[in-house]
Amino acid sequence: MKKPKGLLRIALATTALVVACGGEKADTKAPAAGAAPSTSAKGKDAITIAMIAKSSTNPVFLAARTGAEAAAKELSEKDNIKVTVNWLTPPEEDGQVQAQRIQQAVNDGADAILISCSDAGKVTGAINDAVDRGVAVMTFDSDAPQSKRFAYYGVDDNKTGQVTMAELARLMNGKGKVAILAGNQNAPNLQHRVQGAKDEAAKYPGITIAGVFNHVETPQDAAAEVVRVDNAYPDIQGWAMIGGWPLFTRALLTDAKFAKMKVVSVDAMPEELDYVAKGITPTLYAQSVYLWGDVGVRTIVDKLHFKKDVPKIIPMELVKVSKENLNAWAKQLKDWGFTNVDPKYLK
């Protein structure tokens, strides 16, 4: 697999940064999509992939779409095949709508489906039906492990929750009351992150959890929930955010109460960089969201065109982003096609 532009730069910049769980080093290397060499017999020369993310208003999934479309264009030119990505993501999170979009993709003649599941229980039946009708299904970000999907690409969600809480506990010197911001309560990946955060918090006698707070996954709704909780629980001293939703808006940059908190968040999108620079959120754990689409498309092409065997689980490693490597990460985002990276971080 071709390494996306800029990955070497950020990998070098983060060599010394260690994810605080199991001592694993964070990096941005995209894993090889196929473990076995391709056979001499080639498969499909025209592949249509229906991409169904959780929400078309969430910038992390727009980045994944960009990665998918870029990979499709590259592979089409390089390997003399026609790879098309059809974006079938609903405007808001809704597992039932996703199930309908899966059925739509099958009826439209898609060869494969690449999906991040809002609710595994609501899409597993539709995934299985698609596979039974000859459509290959791969999940990313949020899995449906009991389904007939052939592969999943994403972070270890339990570990993601653990490292987020461990870093927060470190910043708080192991004591204080914290809250967990958790997004969609039905999303299986977020459920695992919450459990990981809880398990990690239990290791610190001085850390207590005020609650787990779910919300609609838009920046505005997430920021409003943070403000509501801060007012309802004035003794909260820290936030473990298992997704970066409220930091996708600038609203909390001027919130005096929030500025006094210790905050650690998953994701590191362009909108979040100011929170790091100002010290409001000292640590972000980035998912290389562009690669959700890039690796997803390459894996599907490996399976359907090159007839490779691909692993059922393709791990993505988190990248620890702080002031020390903020500029390098900003340049990586720009290399991935983000147009809203503040120029001051690109110097």
Residues covered by each model-derived region:
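A residue-level marker of the well-folded mature domains of exported/periplasmic proteins
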Residues: K2-K3, V19-K347
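Bacterial N-terminal signal peptides that target proteins for export
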Residues: M1-A11
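Hydrophobic alpha-helical targeting segments used for export or membrane insertion
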Residues: L12-A20
